[in-house]
Every structure is written in C-alpha cells, then in structure tokens.
Regions:
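Short histidine-centered catalytic/ligand-binding loop motif
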Residues: 28-42, 138-150, 187-197
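Intrinsically disordered, low-complexity regulatory tails
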Residues: 1-14, 227-230, 234-244
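Short, conserved phosphate-binding/catalytic loop or strand-edge motifs used
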Residues: 172-182
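SsDNA-processing nucleotidyl-transfer enzymes
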Residues: 11-15, 21, 43, 47-147, ...
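Acidic, metal-coordinating catalytic segment for phosphate/diphosphate chemistry
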Residues: 17-37, 241
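Helical (often loop-to-helix) elements that flank the catalytic cores of nucleotide-handling enzymes
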Residues: 77-97, 146-162, 182-215, 235-244
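Short beta-strand
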Residues: 65-67, 168-174, 219-223
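Short loop/turn segments at secondary-structure transitions that flank enzyme active sites
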Residues: 26, 52, 70, 83, ...
C-alpha cells in the first residue's frame, strides 16, 4: 500500500497465524522508501500468493534461503529437513537426507516461521524429481548494464525460442536479471532427461553468443562477461535450482 508520496506501507493482509512466534520481528529494516517488514508481514504475503506460488514449487525439492535475524543478520542455504521445522520432505535418489518440499498453503506459513525469505525449487515435475518440466535461461547481466538491456535480451531470446516452436514466459528474479522459461508440456511428448535439457539450453546459449558476441556470452568467466549478458543454462542440470 502506498500513501501519497510517503513510504510504502507494509500492511499484513491477514492476522499472524497462532503458530507464528515473534510476529513483530523485523526481517526487512525500515528505509526511506518503505516501512519495516515483519515476520507477520511475510506470513501474510505467503498467504496472499499461495495460489500462484504453489503450482511452481509444490511437491518438488525446494532449497531455502533463511535469515532468522532478518536482512541484517546471518543467512544460510538449507536443502534438507531438520528437527523443529514443520515441513514435508521428499526423497531424492543418491541423497541420504530427504529434501524440504511444500504441499499446501500451511507449509508456506511454516516458511514464514522459519524466516525463509527465498524459495529455490528444482525445475522438475511434481513428485518426479528425475524429470524436468521446464527449461530455464537465466539472463545475468554485467554490473554496468541497465535493466533495459536485459529486457531487450529477453526479447531476443524469446524470438529465437518461439521460432523453434517453443512457448516462453518471462519471470523476474529479484535482481537485475530475468528468467526466460519454456514449459515442457504435451502428454505425447517424451520428456527430456536432465542431461538432454542442459545440452539443449547450452546450445541455445552458445548460438546467441556466436550470433551476437557483443551482447551475449555463454561462459561463466568474469573477464569474458564484461559489458555482456551471461546466458546461464546451468540451472537445467539435475539438482540445480531457480528462485521461485
């Protein structure tokens, strides 16, 4: 909610759930642009977006970025379940510990309780972690580029993919980059393996870098990325994640 020319007001859309401890704990500190955002605000936000968020994260392995003391405190990345965390888990072949997953809006409230500010699910089918259900191109710009450059790059990539018959969607990442997503759909289509998904997206990234080397690069090398956009295809490997 924005009031006049003042700061953006973080206003919960629901009351904090009874199970939420320390609901007034500040996770995002107050700035000149917005008021402080509390644990209760995070719970309310998850409640608000549950219907749209869960189809992209539920029943998949999910890695969490947790900040128990807010943005000014320590952060850590969590993949596996742990005692005291009221979240379902999913078994992954080759891993002794099950991964955290989500099944319901109530699980999102548990994320608020755990101060999980970011969700990074696998790009797999629900309950089928060995089968990709989307291709992800992460457009990662050099620091000197503007967001408009990334938007133009996304349009270029979308044009290339749609010329191949793919349906594409654009997703923000929370930073300066963008994700270009290609859903893998069709009941008659044989789904690709993780290796095939990674190989295909790598070939697209390489094609862009070859056709427009002044704009795109398909390697992680910092030196080669100067003034360019890295077309990151590595999020299509098994166990790789992308922010929800």
């Amino acid at each position: 909610e924005v009031r006049g020319k003042g700061k953006a007001k973080a206003k919960p859309v629901t009351k904090a759930p009874p199970s939420l401890s320390k609901p007034d704990k500040v996770l995002w500190p107050e700035t000149d642009e917005h008021d402080a955002v509390t644990k209760a605000d995070l719970a309310a936000y998850y409640d608000l977006v549950a219907e749209r968020l869960l189809p992209h994260a539920a029943n998949r392995p999910v890695s969490l970025v947790r900040l128990p003391d807010g943005l000014e405190g320590q952060r850590f990345f969590q993949r596996h379940g742990m005692k005291g965390m009221d979240l379902p888990t999913i078994k992954i072949a080759g891993d002794k510990q099950p991964y955290v997953t989500l099944e319901s809006a109530e699980d999102l409230q548990a994320l608020a309780q755990a101060a999980a500010l970011e969700l990074h699910p696998w790009g797999c089918r629900p309950n089928e972690p060995e089968i990709p259900d989307r291709l992800i191109f992460d457009l990662d710009p050099d620091e000197g580029l503007d967001f408009g450059d990334v938007v133009d790059a996304a349009k270029t990539l979308r044009g290339l993919l749609e010329a191949l018959g793919a349906t594409t969607f654009i997703k923000t990442t929370g930073g300066k980059g963008l994700h270009v997503l290609v859903p893998i759909t069709g009941p008659k289509a044989k789904p690709p393996s993780w290796d095939e998904a990674k190989s295909f997206t790598q070939s697209i990234a390489a094609a862009l870098a070859h056709e427009e080397p002044e704009r795109f690069v398909a390697t992680m090398s910092k030196a080669k990325r100067k003034g360019r956009i890295f077309v990151d295809y590595l999020r299509n490997g098994r166990s790789a994640t992308a922010v929800a």
